[in-house]
């Protein structure tokens, strides 16, 4: 028998810890949970936090781009306008058909995965629930925790309400109000509300632009969404390189990948 490499050991351990969680949700109890210590669970939790922030969150080069399609649809629902683009990751055929993409409903419900919710939060610039996490040591005082942001049955709710003739929007994450602030183009308020006009304008000005969607389409990513090389015909100017190096939501090793590819 050959000894398992550390990477393989971590993979098996992670799957078994995950089985503990899934079986507990399904059956109410799991014997797999007895195999692990409190430290094991804490490390597993941090590994998930790091994965979600570096692949789908603000530490990811493509985090905002991955959530852009839904946010564009959300923006058109808020404005009650048919989808006209710019087209990114949406289903254009369905979104152009008001039967499948109505804009006059009092309530909308979308169902998706935890990773998609995280990319949506990133595109919406919800830095209130984000962190710059270390890949070398566990930060026990971090504010971002996957188990709190996108747990089983996570819910992200947007409420539009009329207060004294002015429309406001409020965000609730898993039943807790997340106060909107300057990261969403809003004036800070004790009740967490934001004027709808200000919120819409900020999305119009920043969601597509800040995602770097067109720019990222010239790059090739690996399974972890790390930039590895340019697509055939892709060109990066010096200005592009400078812009990417200043990106607040990139991996710190990305520039090395790109320069090596060029």
Locate predicted features.
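Short, hydrophobic/proline-enriched secondary-structure or compact coil segments at domain edges
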Residues: 5-6, 16-21, 170-171
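Active-site-adjacent bridging/hinge elements
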Residues: 31-52, 82, 86-90
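Single conserved hydrophobic/aromatic residue that forms the stacking wall/gate
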Residues: 1-8, 12
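Acidic, low-complexity terminal tails and accessory targeting/binding regions
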Residues: 55-58, 64-106, 115-262
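Long, low-complexity, polar/charged, intrinsically disordered or flexibly structured peripheral segments
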Residues: 13-36, 40
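A generic hydrophobic-helix recognition signal that picks specific residues
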Residues: 2, 106-108
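Alpha-helical interaction elements in eukaryotic regulators
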Residues: 28, 37-40, 48, 67-70, ...
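Short beta-strand scaffold positions
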Residues: 111-112
């Amino acid at each position: 028998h050959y000894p398992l490499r550390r990477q393989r050991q971590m993979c098996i351990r992670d799957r078994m810890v995950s089985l503990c969680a899934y079986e507990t949700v399904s059956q109410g109890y799991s014997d797999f949970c007895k195999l692990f210590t409190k430290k094991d669970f804490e490390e597993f939790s941090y590994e998930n936090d790091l994965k979600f922030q570096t692949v789908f969150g603000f530490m990811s080069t493509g985090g905002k781009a991955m959530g852009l399609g839904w946010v564009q649809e959300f923006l058109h629902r808020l404005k009650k306008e048919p989808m006209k683009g710019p087209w990114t990751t949406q289903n254009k055929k369905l979104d152009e058909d008001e039967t499948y993409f109505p804009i006059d409903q009092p309530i909308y419900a979308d169902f998706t995965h935890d990773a998609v919710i995280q990319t949506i939060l990133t595109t919406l610039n919800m830095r209130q629930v984000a962190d710059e996490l270390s890949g070398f040591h566990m930060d026990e005082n971090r504010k971002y925790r996957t188990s709190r942001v996108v747990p089983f049955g996570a819910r992200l709710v947007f409420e539009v309400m009329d207060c004294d003739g002015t429309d406001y929007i409020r965000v609730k994450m898993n039943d807790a109000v997340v106060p909107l602030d300057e990261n969403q183009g809003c004036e800070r308020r004790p009740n967490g509300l934001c004027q709808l006009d200000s919120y819409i304008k900020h999305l119009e000005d920043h969601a597509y632009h800040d995602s770097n969607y067109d720019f990222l389409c010239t790059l090739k990513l690996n399974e972890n969404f790390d930039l590895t090389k340019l697509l055939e015909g892709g060109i990066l100017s010096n200005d592009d390189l400078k812009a990417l190096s200043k990106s607040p939501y990139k991996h710190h090793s990305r520039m090395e990948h790109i320069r090596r590819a060029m």
